[in-house]
Every structure is written in structure tokens, then in C-alpha cells.
Amino acid sequence: MRRTEFYETAVKAGFYGVERSGMFGKKDNVRKYWEDVSIKTTVRPALESLLAQTAKLRILDLGAGSGEGLELLTHVPPSEPVESASPFLLTEDRIEVYGGADLSPAMVAQGKENYADRPYVQFVEADLSQGLPLTQEPPFHIYFSSYSSLSHLTVGELEQLSAQIFTHADNGSIVVYDVHGRYSPEWPIHWSRSVEEQLPYNMGYLLPPQEQDPGTVDWFNVTYWTGGELVEAIRRAGAASGTQVKVLTLKDRSILVGRHMDTCFFKPVRLSVRGQVNHLFDRDYRGDTAGLMLSLDYLDDYRSLSREVDLRLREYHLSWSAVIRTLEALRRTDNARVRESIESSPAALAEDLKMLAWLYRNADRFRVLDFWASVMGPQVACVLRNLEQNLPDGLGCGHSLVCLVEICK
């Protein structure tokens, strides 16, 4: 399928207009309260540093779609409470220019419509496989990408684009890479493949389960990366451009809540984990733990492909399971099991479990209509999310892999 065709169809279907989060669709609760939060916390230190040095920022969003990168960057709260007229770091008066570059004419048109009232915003059609757009412009402070937009490029194309960015950028500029991780539990069929191959992907998760037919869904090819492969490609681009680059952050995102965990396009079992975490974040829904206690046995035939990835997935899955077991024990008033879970967990996780136990046992302190929906469920989801965010450097075992790079000239 031509690279832009599905996106143009998605725009026409309304997926890229202004949406509210919810239980299903492109901007579900996991997107807003897990994935967006992960991106924002990852870029926040660099954003705070840039704003401390520069009056107005210049931003280039690569694979911008309809401009969601602008929404992400302008809704990052400060790391410490401060007295300010705005709750967010990057306000409109601190933006000199936001340039959104995308291959899809429909996306560019939608972006122009979405932000027609903002004079600092511009959108351009650009094929990133052919190189960096807007090179006639002064250097940008942030070269941004999100939600795996750069996985549309081959290894060679990403290296070429990176070298051009490094040449164009100024000292202190930040580059944000966001690509698909190859070792995600969503697609074990890709684990044995090479980064040099572009492999099948689809956005069939936007369809209702009964319409998720591999024979009728629109497929296109993308590049799936490991953490080491991405860093090496960035370093090769730095060498090719004669630019020193510093990797600031390398993180996996959505390890167990990736979009395709709840589909069968790339694996034999359909889980309901993302849907259940959507319920946890939904403050109007009294959920349960069904679907949260996961079996990853379907990965057994693939685990030997990478011992490091296998260990990372096992450790994260073990911590995830400890949270859910503790929650189930609390609901059964099984205090012995709660105590056992806390005492057998690593220190940081034990503190989270103590917090959840305290909340559950003090529900009467919270004057809300539904304690589970309003307080307990969202806190459980945040603990699961924070477990992921506190993991070591990314290996490529999430739906997405994000890497922040600083230019040193």
C-alpha cells in the first residue's frame, strides 16, 4: 500500500481532528494518560533547559501528521511547582515557529485547518525519505518526532535525514527520535528479522474487533528497531556529518499496553490488556482485574532470540503481576497475601504497593461517588505506567522506542 493512503483514509474518517480521549480509538485513555505522559516526561528536562537559555523556540516536527506534536510540547508541566500564568512550560509566546512536515497532503491540510488561528504554525508537504525539509530556514531548537513516525524510513534514509539534521542544527539543539521497537510482545513474528528489512504493519487497531480482518485491513511496511541499532545509526550519522552527538535518553514505551496487544494480526492470541487499562483510567467506570493478569506464554518460542530482552520482559511482567495480585488480594481482604506481596517485592515497587494498600483501606476518606473509578483504578494504572518509565535504557521491547539526542558543536 502507498505510504500515505491509509493516513488519508484515516483523516477522512475523522481520526486526526480534535478528539477527546476514551475507551477506544486513536486517542484512547492509554494514549492520553500513559503514552502522552511518557513522551512529555521524556522531553521535559531538555525543554526546561532550552527555555532557560532561549526566549523563543523554533520547532520542526518530522512526520507531524496534523500537528499533534505541537499539542504534546505545549502541554508539558514544569518538573517543580512554580508560580506562573500558565500551568505549562511552553506557551505560545515562547514559540517563534512550529513547522510541521508530513508526506500526506490530507494530513497537511488537516493540520492547517486545526491551527489556522496560530500565525507561528506552518505545515509543509515533505518526503523525509528524500531528506530534511525547510533547510533554508535557520536552525531549529527541537527536531521532533512522535508515535513512531520515523519508522516509515529505512535505515539508510534515517541516517541520511539524521546527518542533514546534525549539519543544520545548532549547538544545543535536541533531536527526538520515535520508532517502533522490534522486540515488542505485540509482534514476536518480527523478532528474528533484521533492521535492514521493512516489515508489515497496520493500524487495524482503530477498527472494531469484528472488523479486524488481516485480509481486508490496509498494510504498509515500516522499520522495527532495537535500542542498540538506533543508537548505532545515530552515531554513524554523526560521524558522516562531522558532528558530535550525545544520547540523553533511550526509552521503551508501551511494553505491555501497545496497540496490537489487543489484536491478533501479529500473534496467535488476542489479549484485552489495553482495553482494561483504558478502564482503569476511566473515572466513570467501575472496572475489575479481568484481563490485567497476563500470560505471555505465547512468547516462549521466541525468548531465546535475545536473552537481554527476555530478562527485561520477565522482570517487568513479574512486577506488573505483583501489582495485580496485590489488588486482587485487597479486594478479597486477604491481608496475609497483601503483606507477602509487599515484603517480596523490590523496595521501589514495595512502596507503590503500600500506597495502593493504604488507598484501598482508607476508601471512606475519599468523598467520591465511586472510589474504584475515581481513585483506585487510575492509581493502579499510574503504578503500572511508572514501572515502565523507571526501567533502564530501552531495548526495543515496547511498541515504541524513543531516543533524545543533543547536538554538540
Protein language model regions, located:
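A short glycine-rich, Lys/Arg-flanked "PGG" loop and its adjoining helix->strand segment in the class I
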Residues: E159-N171
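A short acidic, Gly/Pro-enriched loop at the edge of an enzyme's catalytic core
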Residues: L134-Y143
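C-terminal lobe and adjacent flexible extensions of AdoMet/dcAdoMet transferase-like proteins
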Residues: V257-K409
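Class I SAM-dependent methyltransferase SAM/SAH-binding core
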Residues: G67-Q130
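Conserved S-adenosyl-L-methionine
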Residues: G63
